[in-house]
Amino acid sequence: MRHSQMLVVFALAVLVATGCEKKTPQEEAPVTAKTAPETVAKQATIGTPGEGVVTEFNHRVEEYVALRKQLSGTLKKVPDTSSPKELDAHQRALLALVAKARADAKQGDVFQPEMQKFVRGLIRSVLAGPDGPKIRGSLMDENPMGVKIAVNDRYPDTIPMSTMPPDVLAALPKLPENLEYRFVGNRLILLDVEAHLVVDFVDNTFDV
C-alpha cells in the first residue's frame, strides 16, 4: 500500500514539473535589420535602423495602399480591352485623386529619416561588395540623370524606367502589388504603378 502511494506521489510530481516547462507564446517581434533578409543583416553596422523602423515603413506603405484602393474604387473600372488612351486617362484621373487626398505629403513621410539612413547604408553596402562594379553598371543602365522629381508628381513620360538590380531589390523590404522601387539618378523612388505617381523617395543613395 505504501509502495502504491509513493508511485502516485511520484507521478503527480512528474506532471507538475512537465507543466512548468511549457513555454508561453511570445509576441511577434518587430521587423528590424536582425530579422530582415540576410542581405540586410550583413550590413547591420551601416545605417542600422532602430527597433521597428522597417515595420513602421511597411505600415506607412500599407496606409498609402489603403488610400489608393479607396480612391480607385470611386472611378469607373476600365476593362482589359480599353485603348491606351482610355487607360492613360484613368491613370491620370487616379493620380489627381491621390495627389489631392495627400496634398500635404512631403519627402520623408513614407521613407522616414531612420529608414532613409537604412536604405542608403544597404545600397552602399551592396555596391561595396565583390560584385559592386557589375551591380553599379546595371544600376546606371538607362538610369535617367538630372531629372527633377517631387512627391505626388507623375513619373515623367519621356524618361525610361530604370532596371532594378536583383541584388538591391532582394535586400529591400517587399512591396505590395502596384508599388515598385525605381532609381532616378541616385535617388530611390517609391512608385505607384497604377497611378504612375511618385509616392516618396530617398536622396543620395550612392555616389555618382
Report residues per predicted region.
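Bacterial N-terminal signal peptides
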Residues: 8-17
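Bacterial signal peptide processing site
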Residues: 19-23
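Post-signal peptide N-terminal segment of mature Sec-exported envelope proteins
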Residues: 27-52, 56
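Mid-length scaffold segments of soluble, non-membrane domains
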Residues: 89-164
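Early exported N-terminus immediately downstream of N-terminal targeting peptides
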Residues: 50-114
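Amphipathic, charged alpha-helical segments and their helix-to-coil junctions
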Residues: 136-208
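Short, low-complexity, intrinsically disordered N-terminal modules
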Residues: 17-18, 29
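Bacterial N-terminal signal peptides that target proteins for export
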Residues: 1-8
